[in-house]
């Protein structure tokens, strides 16, 4: 597939999105830029864009094989990928298997507590409001998504969790929690979009409990570039 790359449509914290000669396809470019604390902390993680691009593409393809529709179309090079153009549903969809991060402060649960069942959370994607947590009643009342869309999103989110947990465990990695984003195709179909990477997931070494994700940057622990490379090595060889 050969699409002509055109003007930049959007630039976010970690990616740039470009139009192409096909109105249904865009090109995503993954950057090394890193932010934390609502954008208060800024920096770079060496080769993060390469890791996130390759890892996300590989995982999206595995999820497709398990019946979860994704935006993935074609990897172009180390940092660029063609994906289906979507209208992003303005919800961050968070699945938690183990207590970590802000959840421990919010709920008073010690970090590392294994939940009996996965927790599904929504936050409203709005930078000005700092992405507040909401429930599905908010989403309906604010017209962020329909009930049918929310049901589909929840179904896919739990399925993604099942598939990813197994993939990660095979690589001796615990899937602690992760954030997903979904989008609508031009016909209204809901598909998985954005990325699946150490930027959007918490990965712990299953033996040592060592962090293998963006928490190393968030907490100024160091070693984040090596951790990202380690995840890619374990999952992609």
For each predicted feature, which ranges?
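ATP-dependent carboxylate/phosphate-activation module, predominantly the ATP-grasp catalytic core
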Residues: 47, 106-152
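C-terminal helix-cap and adjacent tail motif
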Residues: 113, 196-237
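Phosphate-binding core of ATP-grasp and ATP-grasp-like enzymes
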Residues: 113-130, 161-174, 197-202
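Short amphipathic alpha-helical segments
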Residues: 47, 51-55, 148-156, 160, ...
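Active-site loop/lid in soluble adenylation, ligation, and acyl-transfer enzymes
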Residues: 2-123, 235
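A long amphipathic alpha-helix within ATP-dependent nucleotide-binding catalytic cores
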Residues: 144-176
